[in-house]
Amino acid sequence: MSHSVKIYDTCIGCTQCVRACPTDVLEMIPWDGCKAKQIASAPRTEDCVGCKRCESACPTDFLSVRVYLWHETTRSMGIAY
């Protein structure tokens, strides 16, 4: 079951989440919106196992990367059974 991975613009480009991900869901891409000139991206969300290690590794106060587990996503959209 696939999970949603959202990267917010509070990302500082530190690569901590990319290094923490055991299934290589995340990667860094060029971005001019921060000092590091890069931001995390989640091109392989189908491989996300929902461990949330990326969230734990994020050093920003705003949790720049968030994993929404399948049941959390459907519940927030009002379509849970």
Curated annotation (Swiss-Prot):
Name used for this protein in its record: Photosystem I iron-sulfur center
Listed cofactors: [4Fe-4S] cluster
Bilayer topology annotation: Peripheral membrane protein
Sequence positions that bind [4Fe-4S] cluster 1: C11, C14, C17, C58
Pfam entry (one): Fer4_21
Statement: the UniProt record of this protein carries the keyword Plastid: yes
PROSITE patterns, per database record: 4FE4S_FER_1, 4FE4S_FER_2
Signal peptide annotation: none
Biological function: Apoprotein for the two 4Fe-4S centers FA and FB of photosystem I (PSI); essential for photochemical activity. FB is the terminal electron acceptor of PSI, donating electrons to ferredoxin. The C-terminus interacts with PsaA/B/D and helps assemble the protein into the PSI complex. Required for binding of PsaD and PsaE to PSI. PSI is a plastocyanin-ferredoxin oxidoreductase, converting photonic excitation into a charge separation, which transfers an electron from the donor P700 chlorophyll pair to the spectroscopically characterized acceptors A0, A1, FX, FA and FB in turn.
Keyword Nuclease: no
HAMAP family attached to this UniProt entry: PSI_PsaC
A GO MF label: oxidoreductase activity
One GO BP annotation of this record: photosynthetic electron transport in photosystem I
Chief localisation class: plastid
Catalytic activity, as annotated: reduced [plastocyanin] + hnu + oxidized [2Fe-2S]-[ferredoxin] = oxidized [plastocyanin] + reduced [2Fe-2S]-[ferredoxin]
All copies of domain 4Fe-4S ferredoxin-type, residue ranges: 2-31, 39-68
Any one Gene Ontology cellular component term annotated for this protein: chloroplast thylakoid membrane
This enzyme's EC code(s): 1.97.1.12
Subunit structure: The eukaryotic PSI reaction center is composed of at least 11 subunits.
Annotated localization: Plastid, Chloroplast thylakoid membrane
Residues annotated as binding [4Fe-4S] cluster 2: C21, C48, C51, C54
Key words of the record: 4Fe-4S, Chloroplast, Electron transport, Iron, Iron-sulfur, Membrane, Metal-binding, Oxidoreductase, Photosynthesis, Photosystem I, Plastid, Repeat, Thylakoid, Transport
Gene transcribed to yield this protein: psaC
NCBIfam families: PS_I_psaC
Cofactor detail note: Binds 2 [4Fe-4S] clusters. Cluster 2 is most probably the spectroscopically characterized electron acceptor FA and cluster 1 is most probably FB.
